[in-house]
Structure formats: C-alpha cells, structure tokens
Curated annotation (Swiss-Prot):
Its EC number is 2.7.1.50. The keyword Ligase does not apply. Its cofactor is Mg(2+). Keywords: ATP-binding, Kinase, Magnesium, Metal-binding, Nucleotide-binding, Thiamine biosynthesis, Transferase. This is Hydroxyethylthiazole kinase. Belongs to the Thz kinase family. Catalyzes the phosphorylation of the hydroxyl group of 4-methyl-5-beta-hydroxyethylthiazole (THZ). The keyword tRNA processing does not apply.
Amino acid sequence: MQVDLLSSAQSAHALHLFHQHSPLVHCMTNDVVQTFTANTLLALGASPAMVIETEEASQFAAIASALLINVGTLTQPRAQAMSAAVEQATRSQTPWTLDPVAVGALDYRRRFCVELLSHKPTAIRGNASEIMALAGVANGGRGVDTTDAAANAIPAAQTLARETGAIVVVTGEVDYVTDGHRIIGIHGGDPLMTKVVGTGCALSAVVAACCALPGDTLENIASACHWMKQAGERAVARSEGPGSFVPHFLDALWQLAQEVQA
C-alpha cells in the first residue's frame, strides 16, 4: 500500500486557490463548535454561514459554494433540515461533506449517516473509529473519541471511497486522505490539538470548502489537513495550554493564508 506525501508547493498552491475563491460554506454543524468553526474558515479566507431552519437550509444549499453536514448534536428536527439541504445540494451540484461524529457509538446517527451516503457526499471526514463504523467493518469509538489508530482505518476508508465516490479523510496523529486508489499521508500537528473542542469539526468545514476549489480535489483536501496541522504546531509553540492555544491557532491560520499571498 503506497502512501504519498503532500509537498509544500502543493499545499501552498491550494491555499492560494482557497484565498482566491473564498468559498461560501454552509455549515450545518454541531452546537459545541459553531463559533470556532466559523472563525477557522474566516481566518483562512472563506465565508461561513450557519443556516439550520429546514426551509432556509434547503434554499441556502443551492446558494452556497459547499455544504457541511456534522451530526455531533443531532436531533430529529435537525436531521430533517440536514436531509433537505443534502437533497438540494445534490440537485444543485453543490459539493457536500459529511462528518459522522460518534457514528460508531450511537444507532440513530449511524442509520441517518448511512441514509445520507445514498446522496453521494463529495468528502467524508472522521476519526478512525467513525470511518470504520461508517464503512460497516467495525462498531466502536468512545463517543467522539477514537479507539483505533488512523492507519488501521485505511482499508475501510478506501472501501468507503470506492463505494460512495467520496474522498475520505481519516484523521489522527497522521491524517490519511484517499479516493479509494491514491492515498496521501499528512504528518504534523500536536497532541494539544486533541484537548481543544472543535479542531476536527473545524477541519471538516475546511475540507468542505476545499471541495469547491478547482483542480485536484484529493490534493486540495489533503492540503486542508496540512494547514490545520501547521497552524497547530505554530500555536503550540506560543501557548501555555488549551486556553491560550485557540487564539494562537486562529492567528496561525491567518498568517499561513497571508504568507501565500505575499
């Protein structure tokens, strides 16, 4: 199994495209991470929108550059709004990304996410346990936490990618991005990133934005993982703990975006 690495030039090119196109991302995400997700997108040069009412969600999915579905705080009314948005995104050819939070641990959200797969997401982003559960090869995870190493989920990610046509991202100490055939590994980051709520969910929003960019979508999505890990490393170097990490992380994302424009 060959795992390719992403070059700095590829990452910088994708970030230049990101800033140039400034995708409008319709984030139907969980209640815990909305502010952090919006600020992450803004720092990189995208435009976030959080539209959740069913009628409006469907309408906005046709306007947005990309749609994110994150099931972290799923309720039945929210599931209805998400389904309506995904159906409209499919009709409008708006790329959409699924973040199947805790799908391996809870039955209702697993059934819901499996139903959404029939609408062919452009990308799927999860930890190893979530990806393995969604692929039907394992049940597990400890809520939102993974109990599996990212590398162990590569076969499941490849299967899921081939079955759905999505680009699948498995995040962990090393992130793996696959279209079912090619695999790109992204190293970096810091364990402190796991002590801040929302870094994975925010990455899913950046992945969604990258689905709206021209060029090689696999490389663009892998670049999103690289930016987040780079920013995490820079932020940790300036931080004393999780509380001071967040503002330094947002600053680091902003600085990365500015550097490619220089």
